[in-house]
Regions:
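Short hydrophobic alpha-helices and adjacent helix-cap/hinge residues
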Residues: 1-318
Length: 318
């Protein structure tokens, strides 16, 4: 433990020292939520603090919620790039793509991007190129396991609707992966791309009784209540991509917690502020993948949760 603390202190010291005597570094934060403080923001703060970097002394966070509005995300990204920020932190693929279209020079670190190569954000994982790096949430790689967990929790499911945003290229790739593994799991996959909340609600209302639902990444940015309320009403067998949804009432999720990803990405942020180039920093994969279940929802829906799933679960919400 002492060695870890010493290593973090040595890592952060040059940046803190450089910040003395001049204005703190400015980090623009663009995220999908409705309020400034969301899990990715809190995760970023925690990660920077663990590195010994203090808000106010070493850096400031200029936070821009986009309320699920892609056009607003583009506007905020363009304004931040022109304002002289030292780095932009982007949550979600579509926000990261908006930032990339706004600037080719301001460094960007992303989180909650399922497949950054498929999304066109980086040239490759080991050699990102350009002004971009970040933490991949592995949407494509985790899709087979998500379907396996869906089948384990809801064994009667035979048909699964994969609903994703039409502009989210990572989710499109995950939908193709779902098709590839469907035969092995004896499932029929129906992939549907949507663009608006109305599209999403309309699509979900066409689910047949007993149909399963898979959301490989965020479908509609910042509106979890819509999909969760509909799930509870229709008693869908559904699996989500992060524990955030389970905490809000979903039955089960498998994937990386966004606050953990943001804390992990803080190391990349610090390295860039120290002078390293994003193109030289390989894209990292989420280092925390967890299975989470919500027992209250399980009880409300009358689901018999397999003992193996309860034992395997990393997080259980009572």
């Amino acid at each position: 433990m002492c060695l870890v603390v010493l290593a973090l202190a040595l890592f952060a010291a040059p940046l803190a020292a450089d910040a003395q005597g001049k204005p703190p570094y400015r980090i623009g934060v663009v995220h999908t939520g409705f309020v400034p403080n969301t899990p990715p923001v809190e995760g970023l703060r925690a990660g920077l603090k663990a590195l010994g970097l203090q808000e106010g002394r070493d850096l400031t966070l200029d936070i821009h919620p986009t309320k699920g509005d892609l056009q607003l995300a583009q506007t905020e990204a363009t304004a931040l790039a022109a304002s002289g920020v030292d780095l932009i932190f982007a949550e979600s693929e579509r926000i990261a793509r908006a930032v990339k279209s706004a600037t080719q020079t301001v460094p960007m670190v992303f989180v909650q991007v399922g497949d950054p190569v498929a999304a066109g954000l980086v040239t490759s994982v080991p050699h990102p190129g350009g002004n971009v790096t970040g933490v991949s949430s592995l949407a494509t790689e985790l899709t087979p396991k998500r379907l396996e967990f869906l089948k384990a929790v809801f064994p009667s499911v035979r048909r699964v609707r994969v609903v994703y945003h039409a502009d989210d290229l990572s989710s499109g790739a995950a939908a193709h992966t779902a098709q590839d593994v469907a035969g092995r799991l004896k499932l029929k996959i129906v992939a549907r791309a949507v663009r608006t909340e109305a599209d999403l609600v309309s699509e979900l209302k066409t689910l047949r009784p007993g149909d399963g639902l898979l959301s490989p990444t965020t479908v509609m940015m910042g509106i979890p209540g819509t999909i969760l309320d509909l799930q509870l009403m229709a008693r869908w067998p559904a699996i989500f991509y992060t524990s955030f949804w389970v905490q809000g009432g979903a039955v089960v999720a498998y994937g990386s917690p966004v606050d953990h990803d943001a804390a992990q990405a803080a190391r990349l942020v610090a390295r860039i502020l120290r002078g390293e180039r994003p193109q030289d920093l390989p894209v990292e994969s989420s280092n925390t993948i967890e299975l989470s279940i919500n027992l209250k929802t399980v009880t409300a829906l009358g689901i018999t949760m397999p003992a193996a799933i309860r034992t395997r679960a990393d997080r259980i919400f009572p």
